[in-house]
């Protein structure tokens, strides 16, 4: 429903009927954000890994955590109030702005692998030395574009009903642009990583050890760039109901779309687990943290094994 006789200063609310949905979203997204924080701490406590993977895996890990915080705090705020049987009240302008910020930061988090892909393309294919802050500059430009798209909801949008706010200033055209741009940039990241992987496998003539590490890291980055696309498929399917009026099962539209909220965890963990250097250290922590004394011997064995099987200088990955 579209409203014409209201303004941005009109008071709107988040209805109690939104409680179950936001609770489910927060349980999924909040859990992933917390685990993402642990992954950030894991890197920070291991300077050798931090130095090695700072512009690649750590950048994506920290970036997804930071960019997931606005949505995390919004969900937490709504869950607390709605379970207290209080409907949050704010102006349409405030609710629209918050919605725009959380939507844009979510998209920015999903396209983080693109900056890494561009960075590695220059290093691997073009054989150029690039500073680690290059990924920050590239992603800042991409983020600015998303924020501009989000703000355009104000001049181009209309007052419509919404689940999060009873009335919201919203533009279907800008939302379609945001979703399409997110998907397009993710596909571009996959394309670049495939190009890098093909180059490394066929044309890279460096020594065997460097070549092996470069192939491993390239495969890891390719896997990482595919995760945001895979977890967003249910949301893309759900958009057919929103834009074209196709009827979808209620369970799909209220539950399966939430796979998008798995991205803050699956995107960084996929690349971390695909590299033996990181995977063995993570396994060592899990074993030493959650198992009893008897299995700590296994943890020590895993640690020793990882030190003998993995290249002794993980910093060699920095040249990959």
Curated annotation (Swiss-Prot):
The keyword Membrane applies. It comes from the Eukaryota. The chain crosses the membrane at residues 24-44, 65-85, 105-125, 132-152, 179-199, 226-246, 253-275. InterPro entries: DUF1182. Pfam families: DUF1182. Keywords: Membrane, Transmembrane, Transmembrane helix. It comes from Caenorhabditis elegans. The lineage of its organism: Eukaryota, Metazoa, Ecdysozoa, Nematoda, Chromadorea. It is found in: Membrane. It is a multi-pass membrane protein. Its main location: membrane. This is Uncharacterized protein ZK757.1. GO terms for cellular component: membrane.
């Amino acid at each position: 429903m579209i409203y014409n006789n209201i303004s941005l200063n009109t008071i709107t609310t988040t209805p109690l009927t939104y409680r179950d949905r936001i609770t489910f979203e927060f349980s999924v997204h909040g859990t992933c954000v917390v685990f993402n924080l642990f992954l950030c701490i894991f890197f920070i406590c291991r300077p050798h890994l931090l130095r090695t993977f700072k512009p690649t895996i750590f950048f994506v890990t920290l970036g997804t955590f930071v960019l997931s915080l606005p949505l995390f705090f919004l969900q937490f705020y709504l869950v607390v109030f709605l379970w207290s049987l209080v409907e949050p009240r704010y102006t349409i302008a405030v609710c629209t702005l918050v919605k725009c910020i959380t939507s844009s930061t979510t998209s920015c988090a999903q396209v983080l692998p693109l900056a890494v892909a561009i960075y590695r393309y220059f290093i691997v294919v073009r054989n150029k030395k690039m500073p680690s802050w290059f990924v920050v500059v590239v992603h800042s430009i991409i983020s600015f574009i998303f924020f501009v798209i989000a703000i355009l909801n104000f001049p181009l949008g209309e007052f419509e009903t919404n689940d999060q706010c009873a009335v919201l200033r919203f533009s279907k055209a800008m939302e379609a642009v945001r979703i399409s741009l997110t998907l397009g940039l993710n596909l571009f990241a996959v394309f670049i990583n495939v190009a890098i992987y093909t180059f490394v496998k066929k044309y890279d003539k460096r020594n065997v050890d460097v070549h092996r590490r470069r192939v491993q890291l390239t495969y890891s980055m390719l896997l990482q760039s595919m995760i945001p696309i895979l977890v967003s498929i249910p949301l893309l399917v759900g958009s057919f109901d929103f834009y074209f009026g196709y009827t979808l099962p209620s369970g799909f539209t209220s539950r399966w779309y939430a796979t998008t909220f798995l991205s803050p965890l699956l995107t960084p963990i996929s690349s971390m687990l695909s590299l033996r250097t990181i995977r063995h250290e993570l396994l060592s922590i899990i074993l030493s943290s959650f198992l009893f004394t008897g299995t700590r011997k296994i943890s020590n064995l895993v640690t020793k094994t990882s030190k003998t099987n993995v290249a002794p200088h993980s910093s060699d990955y920095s040249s990959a």
